UniProtKB/Swiss-Prot annotation:
Domain of life: Bacteria
Keywords from the named record: Hydrolase, Multifunctional enzyme, Purine biosynthesis, Transferase
Any single GO BP term: 'de novo' IMP biosynthetic process
Protein name per Swiss-Prot or TrEMBL: Bifunctional purine biosynthesis protein PurH
Pathway assigned in UniProt: Purine metabolism; IMP biosynthesis via de novo pathway; 5-formamido-1-(5-phospho-D-ribosyl)imidazole-4-carboxamide from 5-amino-1-(5-phospho-D-ribosyl)imidazole-4-carboxamide (10-formyl THF route): step 1/1; Purine metabolism; IMP biosynthesis via de novo pathway; IMP from 5-formamido-1-(5-phospho-D-ribosyl)imidazole-4-carboxamide: step 1/1
UniProt keyword Transferase present: yes
HAMAP family from the UniProt entry: PurH (MF_00139)
Pfam family membership, one: AICARFT_IMPCHas
Disulfide bridges in this chain: none
GO molecular-function terms, A-Z: IMP cyclohydrolase activity; phosphoribosylaminoimidazolecarboxamide formyltransferase activity
EC number: 2.1.2.3, 3.5.4.10
Domain MGS-like: 1-144
Length: 499
C-alpha cells in the first residue's frame, strides 16, 4: 500500500495527473522546489520537503533531499524489524513511492554553455534518491520515465498496489538510466580518446521489425548526447525503417557528405553502386543512375542538396527503398509521397568526425573514423595527370573509401563508372571495376598495388591516370608499367581499408 510519495521532477509531463490520482487515494505527497510550486499552484495538496527535514534548501539548490530523514524513509526494509525500529526512534516516516526525473544533462552538455554552467546540470540528489528506491524496490515504487505513469496508475486502480515484477522492472530502468547518465558525464569530464573503461550512452530510438534477416530481432539506439545524421533525421514519408535501411542510409549519406559539389550516391547492400557529381541535382542523379542502372533497383539514393520536382519525377520512375536529402521542394515531396512505401528522409546534419566501433565476440574495437583523405600527395611517374584527371582522381578516392576492400573505382568526368569491391585480391577488384565501367579515364584504389598487374590491367582498358596510397615493396613495378604505358600515377600516403 502506497501511503507516502516523494515527487521531484524536471520534466513535468503528466505529473499533475499522477499527483492528483495519488491525492485521491489519500497518499501524502512530499515535493521540492519547482515541483512543489507547480503542484501547489494546480491545487494538489503537497508538503514542502523542508517541513520534513527541518532543513532549508542550500548551496543554490545543490542540497535539498540529501538527508537521513528522506533516505532512511526510502531505504528501510519494511519487514526488517530492526530497520523499522530505528526509523521509528529517529522520527523517520517510510516513503513508498519516489517519482524523479533528472536534470537534462544529455541536452545541456551540447548547448552553448560554459563548462561551469554544464556542471550545474549534473544531478546529484535525484540519482541518489532513485538509486536508493531502486535498491529497495520490494517496498518502494520508483518512477523515472513519464511513460510509466499511466501503467502504474492502472495497476493501482486494479490491484490497489504495484506488483513485485513491475517494481523490479522500474528499478532496473533506474540503473539502466543511470548507466547512460553517468556515461555521458564521464565522457564530458574525461575527454579521453580511449579511456580505461568504455562507457556508452545510447537510448532506444525504435524497435525494428527484425534485424539483418527476418529471424533476427533488432532495435535502433541513438546517442544521448550530440547531433548526428542518423540520430536527427526526419522521416517524411513511407514505411518504417529497417535495420538494413539504417545501415545503408548511413553509408550513402556519408558518401555524399564527402563532396562540396552537388553529389548523388546510389547504394545497395551497404556498397555504393553509383556515385556522381553535377551542376544540378538532376544531372548528378542521372549520372549516378547511369553508373549501374540495374543495381540501383531496390536501393537507396542520397543527395547533398535539396531535391527538386524534376529529380523527384525521375526517382519515382523506379523502385527505391529510400531517398535521403537535406530537404525537398514542396512539389518534389508531393511527387515522392505518391509512392506510399518509399521512405523519404530529410537529413540536415553533416556527417561528423568521431569513432567507429565494431563488435567482436567478447569485445568492441574502437578506432578514429577515416576522415583524412590524402597526405603527402605526389606524382611518382614521368607523366602528370591533367587538371580534369586530378579532379577525377580525388573524386575516386572519396568514393573508394566507402567500398568494401579490396576496392577499386573507375571514374570519368565526375562519375563512378565502375566499382569493384569486397574482393580478396586487388586484381580481381580491378577487373570487376574496369569491366563494369566499359570505359573510364582514371582509377582509384583503397590500398597499394602489391604487384604491377593492376597497372597492366588498367592500361588494357585505356586508363590514363591512377591514384593509390603507395607503400608496397614493389611500388617500382607499378611505376615502371605506368611509365611504359603512358599512365600518370599519384601516391596519397593514406590507405582506406574498409572491412
Amino acid at each position: 500500500m502506497i501511503k507516502r510519495a516523494l515527487i521531484s521532477v524536471f520534466d513535468k509531463t503528466g505529473i499533475l495527473d499522477l499527483a492528483k490520482f495519488l491525492e485521491s487515494r489519500d497518499v501524502e505527497i512530499i515535493s521540492t522546489g519547482g515541483t512543489y510550486k507547480h503542484l501547489k499552484e494546480n491545487g494538489v495538496k503537497v508538503i514542502d520537503i523542508e517541513e520534513v527535514t527541518g532543513f532549508p534548501e542550500m548551496l543554490d539548490g545543490r542540497v535539498k533531499t540529501l538527508n537521513p530523514l528522506i533516505h532512511g524513509g526510502i531505504l528501510a526494509i519494511r519487514d526488517n524489524e530492526e530497520h523499522m525500529k530505528v526509523i521509528e526512534e529517529k522520527g523517520i516516516n517510510p516513503i513508498d513511492m519516489v517519482v524523479v526525473n533528472l536534470y537534462p544533462f544529455f541536452n545541456k552538455v551540447e548547448e552553448n554553455l560554459s563548462f561551469d554552467e554544464k556542471v550545474e546540470f549534473i544531478d546529484i540528489g535525484g540519482p541518489t534518491m532513485i538509486r536508493a528506491a531502486a535498491k529497495n524496490f520490494k517496498d518502494v515504487v520508483v518512477l523515472t520515465d513519464t511513460k510509466d505513469y499511466e501503467n502504474v496508475i492502472n495497476e493501482i486502480k486494479e490491484n490497489n498496489q504495484v506488483n513485485t515484477q513491475t517494481r523490479k522492472k522500474l528499478a532496473g530502468k533506474v540503473f539502466n538510466l543511470m548507466s547512460a547518465y553517468d556515461a555521458a558525464i564521464s565522457n564530458f569530464l574525461l575527454e579521453e580518446e580511449y579511456p580505461e573503461y568504455l562507457t556508452l550512452s545510447y537510448k532506444k530510438n525504435m524497435d525494428l521489425r527484425y534485424g539483418e534477416n527476418p529471424h533476427q530481432t533488432a532495435a535502433y539506439y541513438t546517442s544521448t548526447v550530440g547531433k548526428y545524421p542518423m540520430k536527427n533525421f526526419e522521416k517524411l514519408n513511407g514505411k518504417e525503417l529497417s535495420y538494413n535501411n539504417i545501415k545503408d542510409m548511413d553509408i550513402a549519406w556519408k558518401t555524399v557528405c564527402e563532396f562540396e559539389e552537388v553529389a548523388c550516391c546510389a547504394l545497395k547492400h551497404n556498397t555504393p553502386c553509383g556515385v556522381a557529381i553535377g551542376d544540378t541535382v538532376q544531372e548528378a542523379y542521372t549520372k549516378a543512375y547511369e553508373c549501374d542502372p540495374i543495381s540501383i533497383f531496390g536501393g537507396i539514393v542520397a543527395f547533398n542538396r535539396k531535391v527538386d520536382k524534376e529529380t523527384a519525377e525521375n526517382l519515382a520512375k523506379i523502385f527505391l527503398e529510400i531517398v535521403v536529402a537535406p530537404d525537398f521542394d514542396e512539389d518534389a515531396l508531393e511527387v515522392l509521397k505518391n509512392k506510399k512505401n518509399l521512405r523519404v528522409i530529410k537529413c540536415e546534419e553533416k556527417s561528423t568526425e568521431g569513432k567507429d566501433m565494431a563488435k567482436v565476440d567478447g569485445g568492441i574495437l574502437v578506432q578514429k573514423s577515416d576522415n583524412k583523405l590524402l597526405e603527402n600527395t605526389k606524382v611518382v611517374t614521368e607523366k602528370s595527370p591533367t587538371e580534369q584527371e586530378m579532379k577525377d582522381l580525388i573524386f575516386g578516392m572519396k568514393v573508394v573509401k566507402y567500398v568494401k576492400s579490396n576496392a577499386i573505382v573507375v571514374v570519368k568526368d565526375g562519375m563512378a563508372k565502375g566499382i569493384g569491391g569486397g574482393q580478396v585480391n586487388r586484381i580481381w577488384a580491378a577487373k570487376e571495376a574496369l569491366d563494369r565501367a566499359g570505359d573510364g579515364v582514371v582509377l582509384a584504389s583503397d590500398a597499394f598495388f602489391p604487384f604491377g598487374d593492376v597497372a597492366e590491367e588498367a592500361a588494357k582498358w585505356g586508363i590514363k591516370a591512377i591514384i593509390q596510397p603507395g607503400g608496397s615493396i614493389r611500388d617500382e613495378e607499378s611505376i615502371k608499367v605506368c611509365n611504359e604505358k603512358g599512365i600518370s600515377m599519384v601516391f596519397t600516403g593514406i590507405r582506406h581499408f574498409k572491412h
